[in-house]
Amino acid sequence: MATGQLFSRNTQALFYNYKQLPIQRMLDFDFLCGRETPSVAGIINPGSEGFQKLFFGQEEIAIPVHAAIEAACAAHPTADVFINFASFRSAAASSMAALKQPTIKVVAIIAEGVPESDTKQLIAYARANNKVIIGPATVGGVQAGAFKIGDTAGTIDNIIQCKLYRPGSVGFVSKSGGMSNEMYNTIARVTDGIYEGIAIGGDVFPGSTLSDHILRFNNIPQIKMVVVLGELGGRDEYSLVEAMKQGKVTKPVVAWVSGTCARLFKSEVQFGHAGAKSGGEMESAQAKNQALQDAGATVPTSFEALEVAIKETFDKLVEEGKVSPIKEVTPPQIPEDLSSAIKSGKVRAPTHIISTISDDRGEEPCYAGVPMSSIIEQGYGVGDVISLLWFKRSLPRYCTKFIEICIMLCADHGPCVSGAHNTIVTARAGKDLVSSLVSGLLTIGPRFGGAIDDAARYFKDACDRNLTPYEFVEGMKKKGIRVPGIGHRIKSRDNRDKRVELLQKFARSNFPAVKYMEYAVQVETYTLSKANNLVLNVDGAIGSLFLDLLAGSGMFTKQEIDEIVQIGYLNGLFVLARSIGLIGHTFDQKRLKQPLYRHPWEDVLYTK
């Protein structure tokens, strides 16, 4: 492995398995370091493509999302680092695919628990092809002021405290990612900070070893000393001992192997990582510390003394003139996310949507304050749910029953009406359910199903002003307005609409008063004197009876009733009801596998 730097200020990575927070932390680090280009060139999210919006400083940027590793590498040939956030189940396969791409030089495997046999294959392939693996079971690595992998070094506040926004003179390598964060802080307190830090990972077989990276550090001129934090278990540290004895490491090394307390236990002990377990004497922390010291490393007597040892070694380099003072720079301020600022009470922001009918922020959704569980447990029906979501109150049972009757009676009226016809033609054209439904719904208007609101408005106005049916009808005629809710293409005096009769029967038996319905019947009596088909239709029946429902329930003010009629609640009832039938017609045509509909010539009057 050896060679030198893995990263630079121009290094870009491909991020596998989209995770918003680690990527945003990488981009915030880039901004903190004054990079001109984001370090994340692209995201690989198997099965999806497009873009992900993230922040680079104060500006939002769109990072491309690719469905496959090969496509991402082809689209971003300068990205030579592959950051793998796949689970331990798929990390090996995706890592091998990345290693086989000629543009990828470094693969960081974050997952813990990758099968050891898979890891061995990855290591063998990487070494044979001169590529570097960091991990598995790693937090990653960082080159101060240049590039960092994923969550390395934690939060922005910690990065600033550790002075990672600019390069120092210390190379650091450890097995533990968590301890690496602590050591970055320690090193920043007693030296000018790190130049590069790597956590090789805690699995038994790391993709690259402590000595691999220290030999690299030895070839990087900017690194003046090395700090190593090992741990009991395994024999990785002995490869470093051999390298030092052979003179391959010429820079001062300060080392400590954690786990000296293992001797206090009578049996074998596992310390967190898969590779950190007490075994034979050679794998003990004491034996490793002694071997490192014998090879020339500075090894303190305890972990607590490690900070002092690092400081003394660094101070000596300064005295010898081998370390030049680093000019401190003030890092830019990372803009705080709006959500974080609001949560902390630092800012206030206006909302963009107001909702009063439902709330999904708790453990269960609430409709107008009524929990979903209560709706089910108390046996609420569709009418009750409509009363909550439309009227924001629980209406009496006769009201919700009337709503349900309206829905049932208006659910469908055969295949020949305009809405059903449109839906059938659309479904037979091979369109999807929503398109077929909408094509039928779009026919609802003044001439088909959409006259309920107008009927209610005109009946209410005339009744409230005590107009006689004659005055009302003739007044509408003078204005050139058809009376909404009156008239039918098929029904007549001798062939009444059964739906209207059922609604009137229910209302007379259950409503406290039916003033508006009686007025509509009086209007019908007058219009029938003009023509046999000017009967009260279902629109007029629902419109007038809904006025009686609103007025008779005692739960609405006059102003609220006027607002309900003005907004268009009643047409909503027909839209909701007829959607049931239109969906049924769509399914019916598709189930029957009906071909594309073409209207017959003989049913068209061609004229000039």
Curated annotation (Swiss-Prot):
InterPro entries, sorted: Cit_synth/succinyl-CoA_lig_AS, Citrate_synth-like_lrg_a-sub, Citrate_synth-like_sm_a-sub, Citrate_synthase, Citrate_synthase_sf, Citrt_syn/SCS-alpha_CS, NAD(P)-bd_dom_sf, Succ-CoA_synthase_bsu_CS
Residues where Mg(2+) binds: 231
EC number: 2.3.3.8
PROSITE patterns named among the record's database cross-references: SUCCINYL_COA_LIG_1, SUCCINYL_COA_LIG_2, SUCCINYL_COA_LIG_3
Record field: catalytic activity: oxaloacetate + acetyl-CoA + ADP + phosphate = citrate + ATP + CoA
Positions of CoA binding: 292-302
Record-level GO BP terms: acetyl-CoA biosynthetic process; lipid metabolic process
Molecular function as annotated in GO: ATP binding; ATP citrate synthase activity; metal ion binding
SUPFAM superfamilies attached to this UniProt entry: Citrate synthase, NAD(P)-binding Rossmann-fold domains
Cell compartment(s), UniProt: Cytoplasm, Cytosol
Active site feature: 273 (tele-phosphohistidine intermediate)
Claim: Transferase is one of the keywords in the record: yes
Binding residues for ATP: 214-234, 265-291
A GO-annotated cellular component: ATP-dependent citrate lyase complex
Keywords: Acyltransferase, ATP-binding, Cytoplasm, Lipid biosynthesis, Lipid metabolism, Magnesium, Metal-binding, Nucleotide-binding, Transferase
Top-level taxon in the UniProt lineage: Eukaryota
The protein's role, per its UniProt record: ATP citrate-lyase is the primary enzyme responsible for the synthesis of cytosolic acetyl-CoA, used for the elongation of fatty acids and biosynthesis of isoprenoids, flavonoids and malonated derivatives. May supply substrate to the cytosolic acetyl-CoA carboxylase, which generates the malonyl-CoA used for the synthesis of a multitude of compounds, including very long chain fatty acids and flavonoids. Required for normal growth and development and elongation of C18 fatty acids to C20 to C24 fatty acids in seeds.
PANTHER family recorded: ATP-CITRATE SYNTHASE
Subunit structure: Heterooctamer of 4 alpha and 4 beta chains.
Family: Belongs to the succinate/malate CoA ligase alpha subunit family.
Protein name (record): ATP-citrate synthase beta chain protein 1
Organism: Arabidopsis thaliana
The gene coding this protein: ACLB-1
